[in-house]
Structure formats: structure tokens, C-alpha cells
Amino acid sequence: MLGEFRQFIARGNVMDLAVGVIIGGAFATITGSLTEDVIMPLVGALFGGVDFSNRFILLGSVPDGMSATDYAALKEAGVAMIGYGAFVTAVINFLILAFIIFLLVRWVNKVVRKPEADASPAGPSEVDLLTEIRDELRRK
């Protein structure tokens, strides 16, 4: 049983998957930072300095002594709200990650593409075969 498990783990697909998951996790951190630290501030600047990470719609009442403008504090206090700014950030992060993975898969497919098989000489056509059969039958 241990030998079978070793063979299973040593197969290329399992190791490739493990490496892909680890690299994917690290890459998600990079794209998250790109989204939050570079792209979203630019988007916010285009919309007049709006900070999307702090955009939300209150659904419940704000506890006494709390400001109704701090998303993180309200979320920590358990106030019912829709944090659409965080959602927009997550969607942009996903789109960036999906596009980069698309480019990576496209590049790998070009690199790994198998060379086309050499055109082997074509065999006789149907007409040639039928003519040969006809001639053979005439000889009999």
C-alpha cells in the first residue's frame, strides 16, 4: 500500500498540481496587492478620490458612539451592511488573476504544442485502387 501511495504521489500530475496550488497561493497575494495598492487607488482617483475599500450601504442602525463612516469598525461591531467597495475590489482582483492565468495558459500551449506530423506520402487514390481491382479481375 505504501508503494502504491509513493507511485501515486510521484506521478507528474499530482506533483504539478501541488506546485500549481502553492504558486497560485503566492500569486494571489501579488495580484491582491496589485489590486489594492495600485489599481484601486487609480480607480478612486478617476472617480474623484473615492476610497472603494470604505464604500458600503448600512442596513442596520449604528451603535452609539460609533462613526457611520468607518467600514472596518462597523464590520467588527457586527453592523448589518453591504460592503460593495470590498466586492468591487475582489471582482477586479479576480479579473486580473484570471487574465494573467489566461495569458500563462496561452503561452504554455504555444510552447508545448506538439510539432505537426510530417506529411507522409499519400497512398493510392480510390480511383487507382478500383482500377487495379478491375484490372486484376479482368486477368482472371
UniProtKB/Swiss-Prot annotation:
One of its GO terms (molecular function) is mechanosensitive monoatomic ion channel activity. Keywords: Cell inner membrane, Cell membrane, Ion channel, Ion transport, Membrane, Transmembrane, Transmembrane helix, Transport. Homopentamer. It is found in: Cell inner membrane. It is a multi-pass membrane protein. Belongs to the MscL family. GO terms for cellular component: plasma membrane. Disulfide bonds: none annotated. The chain crosses the membrane at residues 14-34, 85-105. It comes from Sphingopyxis alaskensis (strain DSM 13593 / LMG 18877 / RB2256). It comes from the Bacteria. This is Large-conductance mechanosensitive channel. InterPro entries: Mechanosensitive_channel_CS, MS_channel, MSC/AndL, MscL_channel. Channel that opens in response to stretch forces in the membrane lipid bilayer. May participate in the regulation of osmotic pressure changes within the cell.
